[in-house]
Amino acid sequence: MKDGFLKAAALSPALRVADCTYNTAQIIQQLREAAGRGVKLAVFPEFCLTGYTCGDLFLQRTLQQGALTGLQAILDASRELDVVALVGLPLLARGKLYNCAAVLCRGQLLGLVPKTYLPNYGEFYEKRQFTPGSTEVETITVCGQQVPFGTSLLFRCREMPSFVLGVEICEDLWSALPPSTFHALAGATVIANLSASDETVGKAEYRRALVENQSARLLCGYLYASAGHGESTQDMVFAGHDLIAENGTLLAEAAPFAGGRAETELDCQRLEAERARNTSFEPSADGYVTVEFSLTPADAVLTRWVDPTPFVPGDPKRRAERCELILKMQADGLAKRLEHAHAKTAVIGISGGLDSCLALLVAVRAMKQLGRPTTDVLAVTMPCFGTTKRTRSNAEILCDELHVSFTEIDIANTVHSHFADIGQDESVLDVTFENGQARVRTLELMDTANRTGGLVVGTGDLSELALGWATYNGDHMSMYGVNAGVPKTLVRHLVRYEADIAATADLKNVLLDILDTPVSPELLPAKDGEIAQKTEDLVGPYELHDFYLYYVLRFGFGPAKIFRLAKAAFAGRAEYPDEVLYKWLRNFYWRFFAQQFKRSCLPDGPKIGSVTLSPRGDWRMPSDAAAALWLAELEQLFPHEG
């Protein structure tokens, strides 16, 4: 349960209809095996003690008592197990029969939750035997214990307060207003559904969508354990379709007829973070009773997949669709700004690198959207000391293929003059030497925009903004930053997508060569005609920084948890041992705090994804905040590296 991870399982053991002794033994066996795997939450199907298909046998006292005897045996077996378990059984209470979920832990019966919505249509006729549950919670005696009984029950783990369990049963989820909605608003971060959903054509897809959508709507983890092999096939077939979803994402699934076990880790901290930032999620716990329980804290081995590129969809079709959407968003944002400013030109500094390439592609799309000629895009290349033949050539070819206006301004003489003015020794290749060139380029672009009645389009991306890898009032400044919401890992895929759909072979080839060019500001003199300054050698791999950026901003995770996630995401990558992951994570935090002053005065630019750094929107942070707490937490991971 360290870092908010809860190992959970939805289990569908084989059973025999009305054979409580056999079913109990199956449940105990699977419960013990699950506990041995480190599972802390185990959910079994609806009526797993008796079988769902007992029909009018549910009204027989012998079956009812057999279920209670089985429940007592499970309680006894659970005393030695460090797991919360949920099992389904018929329960006679208040003179009526209820379809119940029993919640138990270490021999204690924590609560009994009756089903709210009883289906009485098609193949279902539960109202023939059962009574709907009430929201009112009362205490009844079951298995010699005083137990809360009612639908308005929550179960909270003392050792991990972010793990709060709510319960509903099968049809409850399929109703117009599921009880889980109220459970979540009352504080439940995890919903367990004990189900006996029969299999019909197309139902598995619908069921999966229900679980995914409910977990997204409630910002929760959702476990769905459905009855499987052994149920009566007199009129129906049950397939043991088990599902575990988290905030709209399916984490684990036992497909129909595939064995009946879905198991993964839920991230309760992540769910809490989502709710904390969502002001539309308004808590309401009126009428709810919360029962507390204890589990031994454990460091679960992560089996859930951690995406090493969270900004980039892995599926090629989805990635292409995402790229097209993002390019349209960027182009639309720029088109609106060009219209509003009555700009005659869109002025872009072109280096032959990725970011300026993407900005140019976006500007061309914007002009086409406005019905204007692409020659209204004015690309300016400004070679100086670090410019290489490769990047210069690529810039010219790209502009020619896109049919934009092109001009070259050699800034070397201006930079020499500027250095003479301020007394800069040009043999000293320091930050002044580098930044002086960047600021001269911005001066040229701004004045060119004034001369042509245009607007300077910024090229800097989200990753550079996070790291502060931009010259203050140099490339940091523009009149509209189209890439401000796009991280570097995504920039590469946007350019690659444009290469894939390029109208000509020459355009495709130049885009591919730009993709193959090392990322560089080209501010230091070239060595033998080659780039002498590679960004990722200086600030670290962008795929790592984008990973860190995502989890820092999207969920507010601490350094230790992010380090753990990085180890899982980049496992097997020889170039990323723990020491390297740590080094660049520490570098990320140091730069992120130190460079906030640059982000506090960002030009306008469109929000693209859920992570952005606009000081007018998603990220408001004082420029003089201290990073000490975060760096101290990192120091605990590698004291020798501090």
Q: What is each residue range found by the language model?
A:
Residues L6-K7, P161-F163, C220, S232, ...:
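ATP/NTP-dependent adenylation/nucleotidyl-transfer catalytic domains that generate, transfer
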